[in-house]
Amino acid sequence: MEKSCTIQDVFERFYPSYEKRNSPPAHHRKTAYHIMNCKTGAFGVNISVCEDCGCISIHNNSCRSRCSPMCQEFPKEKWIDAQKENVLDAPYYHVVFTVPEELNSIIYSNQKLLYDALYRAASATLNELAKDAKYLGANIGYICILHTWGSAMNYHPHIHTIVLGGGLDDENKWKETGGKFFLPYGVISKVFRGKYLDELKSLWNDSKLKFHGTAEKYQNSYRFKELLDKCYEKNWVTYCKETFNGAQSVINYLGKYTHRIAISNHRIKSMTDTTVTYVVKDYKNEGCWKEKTISGEEFIRRFMMHVPPKRFVRIRHYGLLSCRNKRKKITHCRNLLGCKKYISTLKNLNAVEMIRVLYHIDVCKCSSCGGNMVSPRKDKYSSSFRAHMRC
């Protein structure tokens, strides 16, 4: 019998058999454990009692995994809020760098190496072209975010880049080209293709690449060269989405991409003893949503393809927005443009305070009578109780 479900439900039902059949790596097992036990009490609980009516509130802690659908809201809100101090009232563009599907098997076999290479190639492309006086002639700033999935949770590594539509020239003066994106898409595509394939060849020459599964055939130097030749001949898809202007619209837009995972709970429609049904975008039919049914273990396999390598940094800042530059140079840009500084509202707030600011809910007040919620234990160093609620 079918029932509506969450990602956690799917993992509880199908992950044990998936693990027995596939022997996943340690960081995959850890991710699965986090998802299955998030907000179940396995990561601790926080208990508070109303001083007036005695009502008891029990809050199960989250796992805080970046792959858990229940743990993304707070990190996303805090990250976006922190960016307010670095966003200018200036044009911004959303550029997406993709690679041919022929490279997927090699990239998946060498995730850390070739994901890093994606960032380097995208960054080098934007820096080189933006500094060229033919296009802009300035140092720009941008944020790169790696996504590895398509709508059906298929493997589709690509880089989303939020690009500031102007920069500082050699005389430290602000320079922009107006409403139109300053780099031709065809030029971006060709330069990015050359730089990424150069990265790939360099890693091959240094014998740093590994070849697993369908990538094993590329251990042969002739097959590897054939692959590179084929990729050189293809037109790589690099495109720029609709531009947006103004700091607040940029901040809101960023939230769509920064803390996404491969699939969210609301896209899962049903689960049986053997299958999972979820909705995907049908790009052959103008992006309409349609239902797709796959086996439960296949769902787990697809989800696990998008667990990032251990300690991998998905959100990276470059140019004017890099940690080294943004304090002085963004302040200088703001002064040149005459725009105000946006002040962070969530900085240094704890979970209780964030809930109060974001959702206008005071978890330190009893939901039954409005009394104060306190810890059931009295602090021996204090004459008062302290509410202890942690998300």
Segments from the language model and where they lie:
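Beta->alpha loop/short-helix hinge microenvironment recognizer with preference
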Residues: 1-391
